[in-house]
Amino acid sequence: MSQTTLPERVLEWTQKYCDSLTENYKQHSVRMHENYTSDWSKQQLESIKNGTANLTNFVVKNGRKYYKIMQREFDTFQDRNEWREGSVHAFVDKNTGEVYKPASYNSPAKYVRFDMRIINQRERLHDPTFTGWAGGYLYLR
């Protein structure tokens, strides 16, 4: 029987965290388009519901000490039609699962915001109704 190590679990938890953020953005987009009656909004809503919309999503980038949670957007400017990485959403310590708000593109802020080793904090990060794609939940309270 093979036991998974903490760093392996942290990677799995981090991927679920990205999935939660992506789902939160999808729910936000649906709510936004449901409030408008224009034909464009109806088309966007339909493409979201049938899965063909190129919505913003979140991916894990592997760093030396941290996993970097990156926001990706689909760029259609001048017919580029490619995914482009935008801003950093959060940093996750690869060995401990501690989640940090970004201070800059390359470094996390000073204090731990969440710890994925603690079950209730991990469950909150994996809940799309708790996480916010814009990152407001990462501010200290």
Predicted regions and their residues:
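Exposed beta-strand-loop-beta-strand "reactive/processing" segments of non-cytosolic proteins
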Residues: 47-90
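Negatively charged, low-complexity tracts enriched in Asp/Glu with abundant Ser/Thr
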Residues: 2-59
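Cysteine/selenocysteine-centered motifs that mediate thiol-based redox chemistry or coordinate metal-sulfur cofactors
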Residues: 130-141
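Long, terminal "pre-/pro-" and other extracytoplasmic accessory regions
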Residues: 4-5, 11, 109-110, 139-141
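A short, surface-exposed interaction/processing loop segment used at functional sites
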Residues: 96-128
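Hydrophobic transmembrane signal anchors and adjacent membrane-proximal interface regions, especially
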Residues: 30, 38, 100-102, 114-116, ...
